[in-house]
């Protein structure tokens, strides 16, 4: 099973066509950020303007996710192992895909952020955690790291508003404490991250995707790191 969307048939006619750098050779761009930070919006923007193959989070394919949000302690380990195995498959697929690819949330986030948060809150038992982390560490040794990581960050009130507006049933009862814990882990992880260059974007205002001047400035920031 593949978790990518179809390649866009046409590019945005209003965007400056001089930016062809992203298609000159194969690149792997990763988009990271908390729940509701705007990852899918950014991935869609990149795919509309460039011939980039997107790879998305396999949320809908996870048979444990709905149960996980209802009872995290019972279903955390099952859900995280599912994500880990499917993210590994996605990494294999994107490495075999010709041209530049962009991924909505990486396997690193699954382990370093989400699984870690669950273990620290005692929703994953120590024995299960040790098994999970050994599997993750083994997988990481065979992965191609991103050429660029785009880290999206915005205030907690903005995250909660976006989560409410998009109305996903399984997300409606996410505790605020859980979101705050994820954000702390994200910030700590970014400080330790060394696989590639990182561009941090504040997404509280999405003008950088709707205003032409801001869009060009945004792409120039990314271009400098590729």
Protein language model features and the residues they cover:
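Hydrophobic anchor at the beta1->P-loop junction of P-loop NTPases
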Residues: 31
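P-loop (Walker A) phosphate-binding loop of NTP-binding proteins
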Residues: 34
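Conserved lysine of the Walker
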Residues: 39
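Conserved substrate/cofactor phosphate-moiety recognition/catalytic segment
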Residues: 48-86
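Glycine-rich phosphate-binding loop used to anchor ATP phosphates in small-molecule kinases
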Residues: 75-144
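A glycine- and Lys/Arg-enriched "phosphate-lid" helix/loop adjacent to the NTP-binding pocket
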Residues: 113-185
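NTP-dependent small-molecule kinase module
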Residues: 160-226
